[in-house]
A protein has these predicted regions:
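Mature extracellular/periplasmic domains of secretome proteins
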Residues: 1-4, 65, 85-89
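Hydrolase catalytic cores
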Residues: 4-78
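Secreted peptidase-domain scaffold signal
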Residues: 49-50, 80-153
Length: 153
């Protein structure tokens, strides 16, 4: 659902040493740490005081995925982004996920804690509704853009 740096990350190794490691262990450790920070924010922010434990868990995912950044495919010169099938919502952003006053939800999503449109592989058109919830006293304006994404075949 998210991407994080996982290549040549400085990691702890046996014997009180450090070395550059690559793989999902490095990427998942970063996402887990950022998720813990978002969970702390949701647990302590008065804006979420009335939420149930399940709702707070969903908020963590909503903030993580809703503030992630699309990743451009470095093998292409046209700036095309990687498909969400490869990188999920995009590159996780710790600062945005822990400070954003707005989080998205998708009405009718297969999993309410995942702000994404489940399009499947059908050939029909799709309609979905994205709600943006503002937990601050400041108004925010967003512009919706779109880009068709596909896998390199």
């Amino acid at each position: 659902e998210l991407a994080a740096p996982g290549g040549r990350v400085m990691s702890a190794t046996p014997g009180n040493n450090y070395d550059r490691q690559s793989g999902t262990a490095e990427a998942s450790a970063q996402v887990a740490g950022i998720a813990a920070l978002v969970r702390q924010r949701v647990a302590t922010d008065p804006a979420f005081a009335g939420k149930s434990a399940a709702e707070k868990n969903a908020l963590v995912s909503n903030f993580l995925m809703g503030t992630a950044h699309p990743l451009a495919d470095a093998t292409r010169e046209d700036g095309t982004f990687y498909s969400p099938r490869r990188v999920g919502a995009g590159l996780v952003d710790a600062v945005a996920a822990t400070t954003s006053p707005v989080y998205p939800t998708v009405v009718g999503a297969a999993d309410p804690s995942r702000p994404k449109a489940d399009l499947g592989d059908g050939t029909q058109g799709w309609t979905f509704q994205v709600n943006l919830t503002n937990v601050s006293d400041t108004a925010h304006t967003y512009s919706l853009g779109g880009q068709v994404l596909s896998e390199n075949v």
